[in-house]
Amino acid sequence: MKYTGITFRPPFEANSLLLQVTTGCSHNRCSFCTMYRDTPFSVESMEQIEKDLAEARTFAPHARRVFLENGDPFALSAGKLEEIALKIHEYLPDAETIAMYTSINNIRTKTDAELVRLRELGINQLNIGIESGLDEALTLMNKGYDSREALYELGRLRAAGMDYGANVIFGGAGPGRLKDNAEATAELINKTTPYLIFTGTIHADPCCPLYDDIQSGRFIEPTIGEHIDEEELFLELLELDNCLYFGLHPSNVVRMQGWLPRDKEAMLYEVRQTRTRLARRLGERPVRYGEGAILL
């Protein structure tokens, strides 16, 4: 199997077959992200994709889930994605779901009919970096869209029958807008009903614009207590059915997961217990390690 550079996947895709169809990220301008900074965006050849599928058939002939790599394969045209999906079903006839990273910008390039066709071919459960529902935060993070566009494109996705997983970043609006960020993001999430929410807190590694902003003081990272407050309000406002809340990323102050609405009160209890446990550190700003991990 061919993989170029560092290959990323969501933690919940650990058992999926990883098939490279693009390299890098077509946007690659988010202010906080360095995942693909050194990997130019390119499209894998169908010859290589078919070669990898032939290899995959030898060790995972009954694979039921395929995750397309890398940063945002949904940047491909609908026709190209259809061609890839048909090849997947040819080599792996048990495959039911073809998932991948995408962005709001790449939904925009597909017609309603194309989205329906892709869903018919098993493309579903797209992982999307929503990050925030607050326009000021989206601008700061240089996402390339606003909340109105996100609501519209996610509505089109859902109308086509596609589920999506939402990545949400706490603290993305800065310490002065935590309440606004939590409220706006919860409103967007409630209106677009993802099947999964993947949370993290704002952080930046060297070589990205946000890192420079943090070092210069142009952006002030929220404190541990502020991160807890924002997550508590966000969670309180969620009104979803059968949605997995995945908060185990090491950048989180509170690490937990559960199903909404079933585990909502239990998770809120965990948030409040964490506030009590870290009472002496609530005014501190997180000390970060690899992948934004906070040592607590």
Question: What do these predicted ranges mean?
Answer:
Residues M1-E13, N190-L296:
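Auxiliary Fe-S-binding modules of radical SAM enzymes
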Residues G5-K51:
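Canonical Radical SAM [4Fe-4S] cluster-binding loop centered on the CxxxCxxC motif
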Residues C25, C33, I49, L68, ...:
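Conserved, mostly hydrophobic/aromatic
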Residues I49, L81, T111, A150-L151, ...:
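Aromatic/hydrophobic pocket-lining residues that form the small-molecule binding cavity
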